UniProtKB/Swiss-Prot annotation:
Domain ABC transmembrane type-2 as annotated: residue spans: 412-622, 1071-1286
Entries under CDD domains matching the protein: ABCG_PDR_domain1, ABCG_PDR_domain2
The protein's name: ATP-binding cassette transporter pdr1
Membrane topology: Multi-pass membrane protein
Gene Ontology CC, one term: plasma membrane
Amino acid sequence: MSEQEKGKGDLDDPNSKNTKCPDKFEQKVEEYLEVLNELHLTGRTSGFCMRNFTVEGAFNPKFQIRSFFAQLLHPINIIFRTGPKRDIIPLVKGFDGYLQPGSSLLVLGHEGSGGSTLLKALCGIVEENERLNGSLHYDGLDYKIAHSQFKADLSYCGEGHSKVATITVRRLLEFVCSCRLPASKYDHPRSHYIRRICEIIRDAFDLGDFYNHRILRVFNSGDQIKVDVAQTMCARPLIQCWDNNMRDFDSISVIDILSRIKVLSHKLGTTLVAIVSQASDRIFHMFDMVTLMYEGEQIFYGPTSRLKPYFLDLGFIPAKHSTTVEFVTSLTYPEMRIINKKHQGFIPSTPAEFRECWLRSEDYAKLIKFMDRYEENHSDIHAFKDAKFDQTRLQKFLRWLNSNPCLIPYRLQVFATAKVTFFQYLHDYSYIATFVFTYVFQALMLGSLFYNLRNESSELYSRGSVLSNAIVFTAIQTMSEVDIIFLKKSLFKEHRVQSLYHPSAALMGSSLVEFPMRIVVVTMYDIIVYFLSDLKRNARSFFIFYLFTIVITFCMSAVFRFIALLSTTAEIAALIGGIGALVLIIFCGAVMPVQYIGWWFRWIAYANPVNYGYESIMLNEFDGREIPCSLMAPAPDTAPIENNFCLATAGRTGTSIVSGYQYLQVVYQYKADFLWRNCGIILGFAIFILASSLILANFIRYDRESVHIPEFQKRKSYSQVASSFLIEPQDKPPSQTEPDNKKVDVSTTLSTNDNLVLCWRDLNFTVVTKTSKKQILTNVSGYLKKNTLTALLGENKSGKSVLLRILSQRGIAGSVEGEITLSGLKNPKNLRKRIGYVRKNPLFISEYTVRETLRLHAALRQSKQRSLSEQYAYVEYVIDFLGLGEVADFIVGDMGKGLSLYHKRLLSIAVELSARPGSILLLDEPANGLDSQSAWMLVCILQKLARSGLSILCSVSQPSSRILELFDMMLILDLNGNTVYYDTMGRDLSKLVNYFKRIHGTNEHSKDTADFVLHCIQFLKQGPEFDYAGAWASTNTHKQIIEHVNFIMDNPELTDDDFPNETRFMTSFFFQIYKISMRNFVAYWRDSSLLRARVAFNIVAGLIIGFSFYKQGVGVEETQNKMFSAYMLTVASTSTMNGLQPKFIYFRSIYEQYEQNTAIYSRTAFIIAFFLVEAVINCCFATLFFFGWYYPSGFYEFNHNIPFYGGFAWLMLMIFTLYYTTLGIGIATISPSIGTASIISGTAFVFIQYFNGMIQLPGVIVGFWKWMDALSPYKYFLEGMIGGVLHDAPITCEKFEIHYVDPPPNYSCGEYFSSFLNSSGHGIVYNPEAYSSCQYCPYKNADELMVGFGYHYNHKWRNFCIMIGYTAFNLGAAIALYYIIHKTPWKRLAARFVPD
């Protein structure tokens, strides 16, 4: 018998009982095997063998916070090599071990010990900064070959891995199965086997009909892990690695899931490697082999039966009642080791010494002997390689055998990804509705604005405007591809690791689905716009227009997908996308004809597909059109037509008809022969970019990750930090804030003088849905007294979190009945402030340090009677008390970055303590996901807090006996929310054990008392075989507790007078704004990628607009180009407006999920503080934009008073910056997600800018929309801006802009035009003394040209004040809307709390 077989745990063993899967599951697995046999897909197995295997990473081990300025200097550091050097650090050092097919391995070690890195390396997931050394082979097949050609056989499932969120279980499993079922000839169609396999797997995991129509996004965590296992079962990997996926589950659920995985491993012969936090003895003995890692060093590898004896022989002894896992993981914490004093030999202390002892041990020698034997059986590597290829020949398409790790041909990959994309959109109703609404709404807006255009020369501008807006809108809407691709990048990475498909196949498949969707909405858009605006009414013209909008959509969709693939971060993608949209609009030919673009940028116009599309639809509309003149000049009523001309661009003398083609030649220099040529050019662009994207997709790295390194803030001393902008000047160390330098005792500081008793009686909680009514809590009663630590136990969905939220008075949707008192006082004032509550996964500002986070909460939540220095001194005592001193200046970070999970849990406790809530503290599963030793240390800290005077109620889901012994009392709930135990537990948990022995009628129980208790809890869900709640209710202990609860409530020790009349918030409104503004500013300052993207956009956009209109002349068309230069400022503002919304929604999520319920600050202060920081940042960056735009555009050349006009233009830009900042905040306030905010922002921008005076001239706006002309803020901004920069700017007509006409006999040109000039009020005759060939220019200065757009220079200060009013209105509306939406029932329903 092999060593691994000896190490296997017996399922009937007391330490592993009740780990057997349901019979239904084993039956379904047998059915699954029958199908695989029928398909000839069984018999493939593989183990692995590692020898001196090392994973090295290159990084800077002391990674300081890089602020915005530091990031700006980063390129210089790279060039001159002045930045921090990267060290090569071994993450996994010299790992030895092997695992036979069908066996299982448990990887132990504290967080950061290298376990996750080992599992990823085993599955071929190696990051850019990592490299593998040593030997690793899979039954003789070298890891380099396996990782490149057989990656699909290696499955890694990490915590929080990506899924297709808007798809049903059935469709997901069919997708995975279709990607892993070879394209061979079978007895039945391939689709038949796919459906059959998926039905079996869904039945096996109880994911039947109820889940078929539910998308994965609404699943709870328990169902999600079932889906993960089912997905892995469909993929049929040879080696499975599970990286702590079950960290949020209770032990019962973990055992259930692992038992299913074990059965699959045994039946299919797959090899299992797993990391399980807080593994009980039952879980531990489910594995065959175990390895223990200590800071990257392997200090044990062998059968599970040898783990504990090995370390006992080394001279260590376990703590009382500790599990095997607790014992061995405690050895990786030097302060937790218990040394056997009778041991005579050497006792290791450092990781290197543990490693040396392991290398000299007999267990290591046995391991090497078994490894040698294993390698001998697979010594002929090449022969096994050939055999391996022979075994997989059926499972690979022959042409791809030696190069492609995917099992199906490319065309089937495209089909599978297209199918899953289709169903993904089919179930994403909100996206489809928003997608269609956006196109239809914009079409109705544009079509109605240009409704029924007349065939007159006065509407030549309008006809061109509707065409330009139509083509630009369809192009700009494809920018959503950037967001779509970025959402899919993590999915691409995961599926690429699993070798389900090539990323290029997914890109092609999604294009095949999304492009027809766009064709549908573009068709609707084109029909509405084309026929409402009365463009050329014939079939040929319509279908040409339709064709070019379609090809432009296709081309620009490919362009923005290419941009998203090239971008490494969302900020870079937004930057490139924003610049791309700006360039697309400027150089499309509509804003400025190509001939006016400087040679330095003209190549961009030729590389812009929209330019060719605009040219073609303009030719399609104007070529062959004869347009009657709206106004003949100068004397149509008194002089013959030969002495008049048409006052329109391209108007001719002696005729009242304007040729549409002549108009295009004069204004744009378009040629009719280019119409179909342009179509070919656009398609060429599209095909080239699409092909480039498909090639690029297979070679770029998705979702790059780096080694987890905490970031810290460099602090030389407290006094230096106090002088910086990060911390207030009052901030000083305790020795400086207290003149007498008196040391405050920690225990006294943390305890309180009150003896508050939290008491609750007959609590019931019910959640009502559309289809059912569920009782979560049923008649729960109890109390918390001082110096007591109480455990709250129960399965998932038993109501633990609900009870804690009700007791803490945190918001929860549902019906609550019962009484809650504080020392007998019902409904005391501000009860929420007197109870500390640590939620399950609290959210903090990731850019803040630990110390800064605690100081913020102390300053905002402690009483105003304490000075800021006292509050900060108290924070230092909390840091010392909880042992956070070493990480006090580390960045908190996000998921997977920043602080370790253990320190984040300590931080959540420290935050509540720093607020000094009172003597009551409630915690919702604070130890979840921690390793056994970290969980024990955290509960020890809770015990220490309880002994210092706090009353603590803490829910736990994966306790061990050693952890349970730290509690004083235990409250157990069943799945119906009934109390089944609430009492002390006795010495060594004897009272608790005896109670459950008595009601079960047994005298035996597991050696692990916690296992026995959890085993009893497991029976609570197996039906009404026994009334556990009734049994407890009949006990004397329960009756005594109820009597005590009644006594407390009937004899209150407090009155309302005992509580001071406090306001809802502890601090003043302005202090809240100040502290939150400083917090937000620090977060922005340290989120350097965001600020870099913004500053780069403002500089680049300003320079692009400025130099696009550089050295424009003084002709009519060139002056109009300068007006469009100012118009482009409004277009550029949309990128900044969209850029602030993700940050607002991020801050809002923290506020709504955590800070709001703790009454830290008001929502008004939240919005104003966010606005102040955004206003400062945006105004600073807008100033950079202004200089890049104003001076290259040459506006200063026309102003005789440069300081005033330039200063006024800057002032208008600043108030406009504040306007769109508040507009973006207001839209984000009412938006549930970033995507929705982006869509609403785009729709609002287009709606407002349609009435800015430059899209449709005010004089020809249809009657229905005339009211919007007076309401558009962009109209007032552009009027003020353009009036300021172009006031008194002279106009000298170019030759083609001058109208030539002969006056009647005996009339000079001046005499002939005098009446017309007086009546029209604009224009100039260049040769008034001449009697022939009069030269008339329509405008003599820019002010006359601006009048046609409805702009007047004299309105400049009025416009400035109106913009101030709009800004104030937006800010007030944002505050009001946030309050209204938060208070409405549907908002509470949308934020409904899902019980645990």
